[in-house]
Amino acid sequence: VIEIGATKLDSKFNIIDQYGSIIKPRVYRRLQSAIRELLNYDESLLRTGRPFDVVFREFKKWCGEEEYIFCTWGPLDLTYLQQNMDFYYMKEFPFPLKFYNLQEIYAINHLKDKSQMPSLEKAVRDMNIPIDAAFHCAKNDAYYTALVFQKMNKRKLDDMYSIDYYHYPSCEEEEIASHHNNYCEYITRAFTNKKQAMEDKNVSNLYCYKCNRKLNKKIKWFVNNTNTQICVGKCWSHGLNCGKVRFKSTKDGNVFVIKTVTKITKKEFEHIKDRQDELRLKRQIKRNQKKSVS
């Protein structure tokens, strides 16, 4: 982190304050050429900055004691911030840490496609927001993010929060079950390996995203790629449900699980079935090739 920038909004989404401060790098003191071209400053300006721990304490004080929630453009800002907090042995944020990923919310509401992750500049231009300061400066980007947020439809905002995964549950009692209108999410404690994780009933069982009824699987769990498994079940009240398990590595070599369950269409079900058949055929061909070689 080489800069912290933020814009504060009140409960009616009015801009009431701004914060910005340059941070003097402690480990990586030279910018990569690609990053230097992107930013609006260089190493000479960074050398005038203050240490991260000093700036962060000032930033936390600026945030205030009242309850607040972070709004970011993409999920990585909080990850980088917490990595630096750990480096300086600073107190963690409250757990679990909820935030609004405005990039994702914008993609869902305005592009109707969660898989598209538009740049902040594209969103600003698409919303006809006046551009009067350079992008890729933390304080300016925070201001533009606030302006985009002001113009968004906030009718379903309470349901559109995300949970930061940098810190995961330390025990079963801390595991997180988060229910939303169109999906549910379950975040587990750490397991020794993927096999142990999938043996846990809270992970392997599939429950309806809406009524939480245990479902019979029409497609059993299968490995979609190295870190993802998928299954499909059917609720007689709420239709087809797709379960997806993502494995996240911990610092000590273990894994924790992020499981999501969403409603899907029959067409999406057929696509998943085709994917399972495709992977099964590839494995069969691979086994046959090994047999012919031996």
PLM regions with names:
Residues 69-76, 80-84, 118-182:
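Acidic, Mg2+-coordinating catalytic module of metal-dependent nucleases/exonucleases
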Residues 41-48, 91-93, 130-133:
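Short, polar/flexible loop-turn hinges at active-site or ligand-entry regions and domain interfaces
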Residues 79-97:
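Substrate-recognition/cap helix-loop segment adjacent to the acidic, metal-dependent catalytic center
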Residues 100-115:
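Short alpha-helix plus adjacent loop in nuclease-associated cores
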Residues 42-44, 104, 122-125:
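N-terminal globular core domains of eukaryotic regulatory proteins
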